[in-house]
Amino acid sequence: VARDTSPQCKQCRREGQKLFLKGERCFTDKCGVERRSYPPGEHGRGRLRQSEYRVQLREKQKTRRYYQVLEKQFRAYYDKASRQDGVTGENLLRLLESRFDNVLVRLGFAASRRQARQLVSHGHWMINGRRVDIPSYQVRPEDIISIKPGSSATETIQRATELVSTVPAWLQADHDALTAKVLRYPERSEISAPVQEQLIVELYSK
């Protein structure tokens, strides 16, 4: 499966904010954004003129990096969102939030989306009693998420639960039993991603 292998701390520095790509490290003073709050590269400390197109492009790139989605897949999400009823930008975020790997992070069952992707790909999680090993799987209301019996990742997952303070209202989690339920799809106000989705819509509408 193709993925972005560029250094994660540099991805955050390039966007000028924490995207929480490295799990526990992002909550410490070792965070790259905390240590170097300017973009990577020889001219990172300089300021480039921000054209409208550049601002829109940066917002799209930041969103892709936040959700750890490649360009082709991101465009497919946008195309699907644009065909749905409602506001395209909100539809896009709802699709991204409903990815299985993202949901595990929101539930506190993974410290980062990369870790969540590994846990899913290695078959440690089930949905409605069936093993699901596709990180991009779209969860639906009433889905029951549970750890596979006998999973060797239990300790890693329990450690991740210690990093989360609250679980979004559209999800319900039992951190002791390592089970969860999708209550409904998220409202825009419940999506904490640092994204201005209208800029992405404007970019793709050109």
Predicted features and spans:
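Short, surface-exposed secondary-structure boundary micro-motifs
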Residues: H124-W125, R130, G150
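Ferredoxin-like alpha/beta domains used as RNA- or RNAP-binding modules
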Residues: V1-L107, I134-K206
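Conserved, well-structured core segments that form or line functional sites
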Residues: F109-A111, W125, I147
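Short, well-ordered loop/turn sites that connect or cap secondary structure elements
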Residues: L119-V120, V139
